[in-house]
């Protein structure tokens, strides 16, 4: 398959390297984040893989959808307009798969955290919190993966109703709040940890990325899946859709 990459940063270059090593896929084009993008920019592509920034992704979305080429969106930071993006995809008859993290390891981790949250829900002696660490150049805070994990925790645990990113001085966290802490440090690729605590014990579930290849490989694999899916069932997808089909 042929993929057009939008974004030539660290992730874009890693995706290009994975495609080159695959022996079965090709890079049709690489478009810089500030390039003038039109529907013709994606001619001859089987899928688009976007790793840019929020503003560029939202600005280029109409052109990507108008091209008729399915889009894999690895750009984060636009959860507040997610419903609007999904509506645009549907109206255009297009396909878009969004994930804050395409690493298969991370997505297995997220499912593990959700199951752990479900298991402790009936037992009030257990509380849960979440933290993430990334390199100092990462812009969004907390990470999209951390927010995805928080959504999993809230969905599985009726005792947690809202996310707290920072506590004002002098205010204690409430029992129905889930704290999501973020640390920016050095060149950390990404570390996500769920902490489950009681008076008797502590359970720690953690995922550490050793490099970016897992993210890039997952993006290429899901792009190939979406290119085929788009032919018969266009729509707005997530990694859960991809994993559910693979695990069926």
From Swiss-Prot:
It comes from the Bacteria. Belongs to the DapB family. Its EC number is 1.17.1.8. PANTHER family: 4-HYDROXY-TETRAHYDRODIPICOLINATE REDUCTASE 1, CHLOROPLASTIC-RELATED, DIHYDRODIPICOLINATE REDUCTASE. This is 4-hydroxy-tetrahydrodipicolinate reductase. It comes from Chlorobium luteolum (strain DSM 273 / BCRC 81028 / 2530). GO terms for biological process: diaminopimelate biosynthetic process; lysine biosynthetic process via diaminopimelate. The lineage of its organism: Bacteria, Pseudomonadati, Chlorobiota, Chlorobiia, Chlorobiales. The active site is at 134 (proton donor/acceptor), 138 (proton donor). Keywords: Amino-acid biosynthesis, Cytoplasm, Diaminopimelate biosynthesis, Lysine biosynthesis, NAD, NADP, Oxidoreductase. (S)-2,3,4,5-tetrahydrodipicolinate binds at residues 135, 144-145. NAD(+) binds at residues 32, 74-76, 99-102.
């Amino acid at each position: 398959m042929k993929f057009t990459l939008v974004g030539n940063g660290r992730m874009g270059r890693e995706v290009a390297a994975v495609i080159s090593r695959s022996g079965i896929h090709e890079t049709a084009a690489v478009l810089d984040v500030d390039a003038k993008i039109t529907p013709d920019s994606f001619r001859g592509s089987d899928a688009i893989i976007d790793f840019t920034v929020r503003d560029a992704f939202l600005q280029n979305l109409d052109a990507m959808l108008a091209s008729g080429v399915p889009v894999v969106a690895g750009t984060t930071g636009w959860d507040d307009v997610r419903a609007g993006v999904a509506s645009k995809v549907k109206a255009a008859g297009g396909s878009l798969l969004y994930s804050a993290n395409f690493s298969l390891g991370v997505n297995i981790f997220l499912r593990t955290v959700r199951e752990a949250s479900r298991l402790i829900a009936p037992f009030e002696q257990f509380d849960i919190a979440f933290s993430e660490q990334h390199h100092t150049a990462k812009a969004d805070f907390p990470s999209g993966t951390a927010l995805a994990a928080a959504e999993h925790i809230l969905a599985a645990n009726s005792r947690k109703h809202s996310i707290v990113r920072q506590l004002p001085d002098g205010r204690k966290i409430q029992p129905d709040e889930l704290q999501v802490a973020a640390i920016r440090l050095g060149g950390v690729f990404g570390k996500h940890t769920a902490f489950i605590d009681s008076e008797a014990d502590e359970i720690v579930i953690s995922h550490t990325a050793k490099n970016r290849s897992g993210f890039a490989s997952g993006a290429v694999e899901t792009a190939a899946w979406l290119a085929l899916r788009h032919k018969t069932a266009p729509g707005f997808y997530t990694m859960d859709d991809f994993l559910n089909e693979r695990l069926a």
